[in-house]
Amino acid sequence: METQAKLRFSRVSPQKARLVADQIRGLPVDDALRTLEYSPRKAAEIVRKVLESAVANAEHNDGADVDELRVARIFVDEGPTMKRIQPRAKGRANRILKRTSHITVAVAED
């Protein structure tokens, strides 16, 4: 049985979040949490919280054994982009894109 958790509109670039997601795809949950705990990336903390939520969902909703869970699927989709303006010299302006992500983590028993 596959159980999932989603985080939408997270303020992290999808490109950076995918680097973290690729590291834990297919790993047992214990190994994945350990990997995320020692990763220096901002996205690692965000993905760790989503993974912990998916594990809690599996335990509470499906009665799954936490020790048998693994990361079945994890993917990061692009959310809406906030457009901001940064003033420059001589009356000009540059556009700043603040990107968001939708992170989905699915865990399943072996």
Swiss-Prot record:
Classification via InterPro entries: Ribosomal_uL22 (IPR001063), Ribosomal_uL22_bac/chlpt-type (IPR005727), Ribosomal_uL22_bac/org-type (IPR047867), Ribosomal_uL22_CS (IPR018260), Ribosomal_uL22_sf (IPR036394)
Superkingdom in the source lineage: Bacteria
SUPFAM superfamilies: Ribosomal protein L22 (SSF54843)
The entry's keywords: Ribonucleoprotein, Ribosomal protein, RNA-binding, rRNA-binding
Stored Gene3D superfamilies: Ribosomal protein L22/L17 (3.90.470.10)
GO CC, one annotated term: cytosolic large ribosomal subunit
Keyword match RNA-binding: yes
Function: This protein binds specifically to 23S rRNA; its binding is stimulated by other ribosomal proteins, e.g. L4, L17, and L20. It is important during the early stages of 50S assembly. It makes multiple contacts with different domains of the 23S rRNA in the assembled 50S subunit and ribosome. The globular domain of the protein is located near the polypeptide exit tunnel on the outside of the subunit, while an extended beta-hairpin is found that lines the wall of the exit tunnel in the center of the 70S ribosome.
Protein name in the entry: Large ribosomal subunit protein uL22
Gene: rplV
